[in-house]
Amino acid sequence: MAALGQKTVLVIEDDPWTRTITTALLAGEGFAVVEAKNGEEGLKQARAQAPDAILLDLALPTKSGLDVLRELKGETSTQDIPVIVVSAYGTLMNESDAHCAVGVIQKPFDYDDLVGQVEHATARSLEVALT
């Protein structure tokens, strides 16, 4: 549960080590972090938690990150949540998918880039909520 005024980030990442490190980094910067280890769990958490931003790994088992992104952007309850996609394989998105994400981070990611993009995405979430 996020404290009043605290931004919530949903981290959808199948690799336990990467998920743990990412969660620790974001929590250390003052974000409330919700974790999901696969696409289905991530979709459930996004619907239930309505996070301020989502950090989404593209290479997920069973349901790909691109499928998750498309579902998130296709549902009224989640379409305005800013999504930052993460990939170890460079750009795996085509142009039609790229416009759905507010940022792209390549693994291994730079700490400052990760935090900066999440801060930007959560600020964007607030702007959308106020309009």
Question: What would you call each of these model-derived segments?
Answer:
Residues 61, 79:
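The feature encodes the CheY-like receiver
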Residues 57:
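Active-site residues of response regulator receiver
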